[in-house]
Amino acid sequence: MLPLAKNALSRLQVRSIQQVVARQSHQKKTPTFHDKYGNAVLAGGSIFCISAWTYTATQIGIEWNLSPVGRVTPKEWRDQ
């Protein structure tokens, strides 16, 4: 009789959980901060970050040394 009672109780608990979930899914959900402002905050942060790095890379005078083309001249060969 014990396994039968345990099975019946577990089914009752599962049904009650399913009913609670069904009730919650039908209620109106109020938007959270992330729902309201998430994309705007992400876009604003991205724009700020890109502009700060652009300023840093172009205006503060860092010598990047990206390519030696035009700056390096070959030496003349010596005949031995």
Swiss-Prot record:
The chain crosses the membrane at residues 33-59. Residues 60-80 are mitochondrial intermembrane. GO terms for cellular component: mitochondrial inner membrane; mitochondrial membrane; mitochondrion; respiratory chain complex IV. Keywords: Membrane, Mitochondrion, Mitochondrion inner membrane, Transit peptide, Transmembrane, Transmembrane helix. Its main location: mitochondrion. Residues 25-32 are mitochondrial matrix. It comes from the Eukaryota. Residues 1-24 form a transit peptide. InterPro entries: Cyt_c_oxidase_suVIIB (IPR008433), Cyt_c_oxidase_suVIIB_dom_sf (IPR023272). One of its GO terms (biological process) is mitochondrial electron transport, cytochrome c to oxygen. PANTHER family: CYTOCHROME C OXIDASE SUBUNIT 7B, MITOCHONDRIAL. Belongs to the cytochrome c oxidase VIIb family. Component of the cytochrome c oxidase, the last enzyme in the mitochondrial electron transport chain which drives oxidative phosphorylation. The respiratory chain contains 3 multisubunit complexes succinate dehydrogenase (complex II, CII), ubiquinol-cytochrome c oxidoreductase (cytochrome b-c1 complex, complex III, CIII) and cytochrome c oxidase (complex IV, CIV), that cooperate to transfer electrons derived from NADH and succinate to molecular oxygen, creating an electrochemical gradient over the inner membrane that drives transmembrane transport and the ATP synthase. Component of the cytochrome c oxidase (complex IV, CIV), a multisubunit enzyme composed of 14 subunits. The complex is composed of a catalytic core of 3 subunits MT-CO1, MT-CO2 and MT-CO3, encoded in the mitochondrial DNA, and 11 supernumerary subunits COX4I, COX5A, COX5B, COX6A, COX6B, COX6C, COX7A, COX7B, COX7C, COX8 and NDUFA4, which are encoded in the nuclear genome. This is Cytochrome c oxidase subunit 7B, mitochondrial. The lineage of its organism: Eukaryota, Metazoa, Chordata, Craniata, Vertebrata.
